[in-house]
């Protein structure tokens, strides 16, 4: 919480507004909105404006609550006890609503828009509905057809048992083969897979293992490898600026889902991967 407070204080320093204003008024800067300078200035302005809308007290309370909630979630997940985590989730939702009120949203929008904008600039619930509503209609028909099929899918792979050490060696080999650079990253285990790091030469992946579910480890690792590949591919020369950062959550998730689903569930992938698994 103290670190969150310090970051908020630094991010909302009034001098930043002066610096941004001076840059925005500088006629010598490139006029092309796609130039490095223009992109950085636009994103720094956006970040500053959003940060100054939040009171420090709310930032601290959010940090304290989410930190404690994460520990409770880990224990609740381990015990399969949702009731233990539910009060923390309720509190996070209430704090998120307050956060949305601080940010504000257009008259035609809704509170979710204010929060989504922090993950994907300009994203709205109306836009998401326009994408997923017609997709859902087709998926319902597809699922009904599959559920009514007289040929059930084989569950052999999902029931395959493999010692954890062998699973780890397997998924490491696969993630390296699809491009993850272990000289600039690493893979560890956690209760829930994630990807993090400080820059594109230090990318940390985690996955999870279960002796009776190799598929979970492989899918999780491919998913996080997709995130890691995107991060490792960011331009190092722009490190520390918006130009050197990911553009948003949708692109990030498109890369993780590409490797987990489009590649990882394809016949071509398994034609290559199966011999490695049975070695």
What feature does the model see in each segment?
Residues 1-89:
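N-terminal helix-rich structural modules
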Residues 45, 201, 233-240:
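Short acidic (Asp/Glu) and glycine-rich catalytic loops that position anionic groups and cofactors
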Residues 62-216:
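Contiguous, non-catalytic segments that form substrate-binding/exosite surfaces or channel walls
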Residues 85, 109, 151-156, 238-243, ...:
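Short, glycine/acidic-rich hinge or "gate" loops at secondary-structure transitions
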Residues 104, 209, 216-236, 253-260:
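Active-site recognition of the HExxH zinc-binding catalytic motif
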Residues 177-183, 228-237, 263-270:
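Secondary-structure transition/capping motifs at alpha-helix termini
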Residues 192-198, 242-252:
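Beta-rich nucleic-acid/ligand-interaction surfaces
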Residues 245-279:
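Post-HExxH zinc-binding segment in Zn-dependent metallohydrolases
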């Amino acid at each position: 919480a103290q670190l969150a407070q310090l970051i908020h204080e630094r991010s909302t320093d009034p001098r930043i507004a002066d610096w941004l204003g001076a840059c925005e008024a500088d006629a010598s800067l490139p006029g092309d909105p796609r130039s490095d300078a223009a992109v950085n200035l636009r994103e720094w302005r956006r970040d500053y404006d959003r940060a100054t809308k939040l009171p420090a007290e709310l930032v601290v309370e959010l940090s304290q609550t989410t930190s404690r909630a994460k520990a409770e979630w880990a224990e609740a997940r381990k015990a399969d006890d949702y009731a233990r985590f539910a009060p923390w989730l309720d509190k996070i939702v209430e704090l998120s609503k307050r956060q949305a009120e601080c940010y504000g949203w257009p008259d035609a929008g809704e509170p979710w828009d204010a929060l989504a904008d922090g993950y994907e600039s300009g994203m709205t619930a109306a836009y998401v509905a326009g994408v997923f509503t017609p997709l859902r209609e087709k998926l319902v028909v597809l699922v009904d057809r599959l559920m009514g099929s007289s040929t059930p899918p084989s569950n052999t792979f999902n029931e395959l048992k493999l010692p954890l050490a062998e699973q780890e060696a397997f998924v490491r080999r696969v993630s390296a083969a699809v491009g993850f650079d272990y000289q600039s990253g690493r893979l560890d285990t956690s209760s829930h897979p994630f990807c993090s790091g400080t820059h594109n030469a230090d990318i940390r992946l985690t996955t999870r293992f279960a002796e009776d579910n190799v598929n979970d480890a492989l899918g999780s690792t491919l998913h996080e490898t997709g995130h890691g590949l995107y991060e490792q591919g960011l331009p190092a020369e722009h490190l520390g600026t918006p130009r050197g950062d990911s553009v948003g959550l949708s692109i990030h998730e498109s890369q993780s889902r590409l490797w987990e689903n489009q590649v990882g569930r394809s016949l071509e992938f398994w034609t290559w991967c199966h011999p490695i698994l049975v070695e």
